Amino acid sequence: MASSRMYLLVKCMLILQLMVLIAKNSRALICLPCDKSKCEEPKPCTGSVVLGICGCCSVCAKQKNESCGGVYGLYGTCDRGLRCVIRPPLNGGSITQYEVGNCEDENWDDDQLLGFEPCNENLVTGCNIIDGKCECDSVRTCNNPFEFASQEACQTALQKIEEERPDCSKARCEVQFSPRCPEDSILIEGYAPPGECCPLPSRCVCSPAGCLRKVCQPGHLNILVSKSSGKPGECCDLYECKPVFSVDCSTVECPPVKPVQCPADSYETQVRLTADGCCTLPTRCECLPGLCTFPQCSAGMSPQVMSRGDGTPGRCCDVFECVNETKPACTLNGVEYHDGDMFRMDACRFCRCQGGVSVCFTAQCGVLHCERYYVPDGECCPVCEDPIYPVLSLAGCYVNGQILAHGDHWREDDCTFCQCVSGDARCVAAACGHSCLNPVTVPGECCPVCEEPTYITMAPPACGSLDNCTLLEQSCAFGFRLDPSGCRTCACKSREELCGGLMASCTLKCPFGFQTDIHGCDVCQCRPRHKKCKAVACAKDCPFGYIKNKHGCDTCRCKKCPELPCDKACPMGFQHDELGCLICQCRDQSSSSVTPAVKLGSCLSMDGRRHENGQSWHDGCRDCYCHAGREMCALISCPVPPCDNPTIRPGHCCPTCPEESSSHKPELSEASVCLAPGGEYFVEGETWNIDSCTQCTCHSGRVLCETEVCPPLLCHSPIRTQDSCCPHCPDDPVTPQTPSNDSMPSYCRNEDGDIFLAAESWKPNVCSSCVCLDGAISCFSESCPPVNCARPVLRKGQCCPYCLDATPRAVCHFNGKTYMDEERWDIDSCTHCYCLQGQTLCSTVSCPALPCHQPLTVEGSCCPMCPESYAPTNVPIEKTDQRGDKSRHQPAWPTHSENDVMPQFRGEFGSLQMPYLDGKTPLPSEDAGLHWAWVALPVLMMMLTLAALLLVNQRKQWIPVPCYRTPNKSTCLNNQLVYVDCQKGTKVQVDSSQRMLRIADPDSRYSGYYSMQKHNNLQADNFYQTA
């Protein structure tokens, strides 16, 4: 029994020590829900009582010289009249507010109880470490905002931080969320302390600028009610204006107060009261905060101090004036350089012009870890070279529009040097080294240099003034001519004089000559090998030049973008404009993942590659072609996998089951002709719809089809119906929702380390879909249903093969011509024919008896008409057949007048069905009885009413068609209703989901409204009738 108790005691002690150890090394603070019944009464306190760090139980306030502060305030809060003072570190480091301090007196004076008075600002100079750099400045402020008094101390601390920086490549840090700070505090973002990889949590700290003090009226005192605790939300002291009842101001005589006029750089302080609250004290002037700034002068001007400021009103700031910059230039080998210009003296030495003095320094090279190296032409530092291997082939390399031989070297950019090895470009980066804290980047050079003077080339010449010279800078395109002493003269320099000194220090041997600059002067860069190209016979006008082929010769194709004259060194590349052309602006690292601007007419394939319009390629499984901005790929034939979770393996083309060892080889369509699965032939460039979901084009004898990208499916075993192009879930799919509380995870991470937000869905491959739910990834597989065709096809980007509807379309043959299904043609002005499902159907017009004795026969009209009723209102007709050909001719029906009649159809379709197999022209019917029209009138009126009710529910769109003279009566035939109003314009209402044959052009002389339900061209022919 005793041993078990001893064992339990030892176990408790070990657990207690472990908890103490964890508490010492942990930065976490766990506060349980407040239950004041469990709080212990604090022992008799020397001072006042304050709340603990969790804000629940009361504890004794810390007294003078006791510890306070620390992480989360674990060491307590100082009593009233005391403040927690944290001493700055001796090594010059920054204060993080997590250090432990001591309680000291606040040193409040009586003036603080009488009103607010701004402090006296002083000019303070110092430095802070911001983003790994020392940022120095001079500001006028009440408190010193700088951590280091000088740049030397800041650089020493920065170098120490770099030396103590740990290896954070394998560190795993928790995601830190920034809190929302009250109005009296500001947010301090978390940062990694010296020696640690993970940043501290962001926190809110009190901001004195957020505290406002009350100004009381005469007869009231500003009394301190409660002292700030130093915590966010309790940062400010609370004052109240209370009347002074103990003093009778009626007997007090106040001295006169003179008004104060402050200068423009200062302001008048607020009115203060005497201790009894009866009289006002004199005000004074104080410098305006944030007034002093450093001026920004225009080009060629520099700021010069005219008078120094001492911080007193009227002289708060230094007074500057922008004056002309007359710094002398530098001259080297006859070339003049302006102040601040950096130039290259030779391969390894650089110079900067500073006040007429050329300060030069030597480039520093890094250590190479290779056995073979070489020094590129015009460079100082060597670069590594590939070891010598047996030459497999002497193939050249095509680089930047020119062909380089095996073994040739070239410079890809400022930091990359390449060599052609057996047809492959082998590139290495230059190794840089420097021994200073702030190396300088030289434009056009890879390695930064240390700007430490090694020698002085020349002293600034004592040159006279050119005040009497009338020449301006822009008058001399090549600069001013220099005298033997290097001073400017009042004469312009010629191009020969400018170019004379540029090649003085050049050591390159260029077999094809040197390149030239904008002035036509030779520069120390070799010209590439001359290209043997034939003259291009091209009629195109290309403002940006021609596109070059693989041999570097011009082709008859225009460049879409101009050349980019830019000398910026952009490590992340350049930005694009709205046309996809490069502009001389560096791309930010944050925008490196943004999709670049797309050129007009290009295609973005499913593998993320960009192809130009008209370009062909092979994606490993099928031939593809960029057609009008759409990716068109060949349909391949694949068997349907019999499992529930098929997948397309890398390097394979057809879906397979996980247990299968081999992949089916896809069968491609015939490449000789464009033969669609429906048995139709198509010519080169023709586009058609193979079904409701697939649009195809004929390219190089291959049928290439476009497919749409299907969204993720959050269910198992989705189905594909005939009326849908993508599979869908048979039941309600999983509905992802964002987390409703903060305890639920807001993101998921997959095996590759990719992060997905809550409720986000995606497709890791074409056969599965995933979603992020409650911090975990749930995936669903697509199963392929069986098919009933011999050769199912597989679209690119989809998982399951399916069958195409290969039903051939019927055609009609008449008089040696072939007509497509639903095509219409005219035999003469009285006979119209149609092709319907392979059968030729024709209709004729029956002419009625006329009351006149001498009827007129109008050209293009079928039936004669009386002279008194003839009105020449014919309009030309535009016909469109199945081939897209258009022709304009006079109407094949009579000019409409009051005596016009509707063509009479007989037979199954309308009133007449006449299959013409021998090609003979039919004779018009002689049945012209008018009494049949009166017999059929009630029936037609009933059909009119029914058709009107049906047409109300149809989805229609309005298109303009020509009008004719309004008939006496309108009748209904084949669900077509005519409304005519020649005063309001002509429109026809048709179903927007089907094609409508355009039968005439608008005529502004007449107007009318037609409402008809369109089924096919056969019904479109019966579009009016009069009786």
UniProtKB/Swiss-Prot annotation:
Alphabetized, the UniProt keywords read: Disulfide bond, Glycoprotein, Membrane, Repeat, Signal, Transmembrane, Transmembrane helix
Please give the Gene Ontology molecular function terms for this protein. Answer: serine-type endopeptidase inhibitor activity
Cross-referenced SUPFAM superfamilies: FnI-like domain (SSF57603), Growth factor receptor domain (SSF57184), Leech antihemostatic proteins (SSF57262)
- What's the domain of life for this entry? Eukaryota
> Is Repeat found in the keyword set?
yes
Q: How does it sit in the membrane?
A: Single-pass type I membrane protein
Domain IGFBP N-terminal positions: 29-106
- Per UniProt, residues of the Antistasin-like domain are 463-492, 499-526, 533-558, 561-586
Q: Which residues of this chain are annotated as glycosylation sites?
A: 65, 324, 468, 741
Cysteine disulfide links: 31-54, 34-56, 39-57, 45-60, 68-84, 78-103
Q: Which InterPro entries match?
A: Antistasin-like, CRIM1, CRIM1_C, Growth_fac_rcpt_cys_sf, Hirudin/antistatin, IGFBP-like, VWF_dom
* The UniProt record lists the keyword ATP-binding: no
Please tell me where this protein is predominantly located: membrane
Signal peptide per UniProt: 1-28
Q: Where in the cell is it found?
A: Membrane
Extracellular side, ranges: 29-931
GO biological process terms on file:
blood vessel development; notochord morphogenesis; somitogenesis
Q: Where is the composition biased (Basic and acidic residues)?
A: 878-888
Q: Where is this motif: Cell attachment site?
A: 308-310, 883-885
Q: What does this protein do?
A: May play a role in CNS development by interacting with growth factors implicated in motor neuron differentiation and survival.
Indicate what this protein is called per its UniProt record: Cysteine-rich motor neuron 1 protein
The gene coding this protein: crim1
